[in-house]
Amino acid sequence: MSLIRRSTSHQLNALDNSLQSYLGSQEFKEDMREQAGFGRWKRVKASAGEKPIVLVPDNSYSALKALMKSEYEKGLIPSKGYMHLKWCLVFIVAHVPKETMGEVCIELRDPGISTADPLPGCQVVCALSDLPRAVMLVPDYDMPLGKSKLRLGNQEMRRMFFLHTKVSGFTGQGVAISLFPVWDCDFRGTCNNYVKVPAVSVGIDRTERTSLLNCVKQLKQYAENALLTMPQSISGGTSFARPSHLSLNESKTLPSTSTTEAEGSERRIHIGAPSNEDLYEVKSAGTTGGPVSLVNGVSVGASTQSAFF
């Protein structure tokens, strides 16, 4: 009888559509809420090029913090047995405009085999313009643990699965992407070989901030009313004309709560905050936050903050 790994998790049942169902499930929200406490967001700079992330079990925050610092000799990583990595799910978010050229490559590697090459079928390459995305990588074997150390870049580590990420084709110098890896991993005394699961990459729809756009539209109305109530001329003979870029065909006319004041030659417009009915809500993993402000210091009132998952 052949031994084949079976999983009841959402991720490995009907892999072609399980990611979508998992992303919308209560289980995912609970997983992300729990995992987010570990500060798992990893930033990848285009100038740095590459970033390795060692996949270790997360037993507690202190344990994870020590492990991510490669302090493997504290007894947190056994030297005997096997590392069993069931799956690794990585969310990738861009910090560049959608039109930006460039791509990101994410790979699952085993330093005991090669520190430069990915495991077969464990590599995904996607354009920065295709982000955000969710990527799943699954190995088909368990890794034996030992005391001997291997060199990974400028650090030493014992043989462990790790993620390798590289941004290329982007000429900027800042942070190009952020990663949020979530994985299921444990150590055990038995080992096995598993049916190969190919890498999966699923696109995530960008958030439509329609309610935010409504706030911007209302701010335009406030600004328009403020401009129309200004004097028709100022020193120098310049006249205020009706702003041509503002829509005048709104079904709802908001009262002007703006005031103006002059400080020397500078003229400022103070815009009142909208009422409660104008506040917008961004639904994202059920997370609520504090007030949100728009650019130029114009506050639009309290609302929920948007968090990625």
From Swiss-Prot:
Compositional bias of kind Polar residues: 246-262
Protein name: Movement protein
Cellular component annotations (GO), alphabetically ordered: host cell plasmodesma
Biological-process GO terms, alphabetical: transport of virus in host, cell to cell
One Pfam family, short name: 3A
Residue ranges of the region described as Disordered: 245-273
Alphabetically ordered keywords of this record: Host cell junction, Transport, Viral movement protein
Main location: host cell
Signal peptide positions on this chain: none
Transport among keywords: yes
Record's function text: Transports viral genome to neighboring plant cells directly through plasmosdesmata, without any budding. The movement protein allows efficient cell to cell propagation, by bypassing the host cell wall barrier. Acts by forming a tubular structure at the host plasmodesmata, enlarging it enough to allow free passage of virion capsids.
Places the protein is found: Host cell junction, Host plasmodesma
